[in-house]
Amino acid sequence: AGEGNGRGPYVQADLAYAYEHITHDYPKPTDPSKGKLSTVSDYFRNIRTHSIHPRVSVGYDFGGWRIAADYARYRKWNDSKYSVSIKNLQRRTSNGNRRDRKTENQENGSFHAVSSLGLSAVYDFKLNDKFKPYIGARVAYGHVRHSIDSTKKITQFLTTAGARGTVSTVHPPYKSTQDAHHQSDSIRRVGLGVIAGVGFGITPKLTLDAGYRYHNWGRLENTRFKTHEASLGVRYRF
């Protein structure tokens, strides 16, 4: 038997695989504006990651159209990067002394889609008693947190050549500068998305659901966040 044309409330549980694209508009390292110099690398400006998370929904089936409220909580992303480079600034061939510059970058960043509370309207196309493809639209209130802690330290030091048969001497740094960019935000916004999928009727009341949804979480101040999700779940109509 298929799902039937009955109406009534329903609940749905899904397991979703999400591809997440996060874009941060941090100040550029070359930004001439005073106080807006940034040490954040491109890695933390343009983040692509993925996660698996559960989603629950409650709704009402009108016999073609459905409306539902859903809730999801995503996995927290965090990472750290450290890099160091040494560049020779000057070398004297007469005595072998040299002056070098050491650049160290330490970055720690995190992003967490804390919650998404959505409301969707879905239309089911009844092909037969078993299969019902569907399309829909979704509006959601999302909460995200993100932070970045980036430090760039530049040190210049002198190395003097020793006498023949002895090791060189590295002297304490004679010039050192340090720049840092720290930012932490907790933002709530309304975003829009689309839904598509297909339902397979197991019993008149129980449906296996395979779906896809795209959601733009809105302009989160200096951050843009978009998700593509593929999900598999079951829907039970009372």
UniProtKB/Swiss-Prot annotation:
<dbReference type="InterPro" id="IPR011250">
    <property type="entry name" value="OMP/PagP_b-brl"/>
</dbReference>
<protein>
    <recommendedName>
        <fullName>Opacity protein opA68</fullName>
    </recommendedName>
</protein>
<dbReference type="Pfam" id="PF02462">
    <property type="entry name" value="Opacity"/>
</dbReference>
<feature type="signal peptide">
    <location>
        <position position="1"/>
    </location>
</feature>
<keyword id="KW-0732">Signal</keyword>
<keyword id="KW-0472">Membrane</keyword>
<dbReference type="InterPro" id="IPR003394">
    <property type="entry name" value="Porin_opacity"/>
</dbReference>
<dbReference type="GO" id="GO:0009279">
    <property type="term" value="C:cell outer membrane"/>
</dbReference>
<comment type="similarity">
    <text>Belongs to the opacity porin family.</text>
</comment>
<keyword id="KW-0998">Cell outer membrane</keyword>
<keyword id="KW-0812">Transmembrane</keyword>
<feature type="region of interest" description="Disordered">
    <location>
        <begin position="88"/>
        <end position="109"/>
    </location>
</feature>
<keyword id="KW-1134">Transmembrane beta strand</keyword>
<dbReference type="GO" id="GO:0015288">
    <property type="term" value="F:porin activity"/>
</dbReference>
<comment type="function">
    <text>Implicated in a number of adherence functions. OPA proteins are implicated in pathogenesis and are subject to phase variation.</text>
</comment>
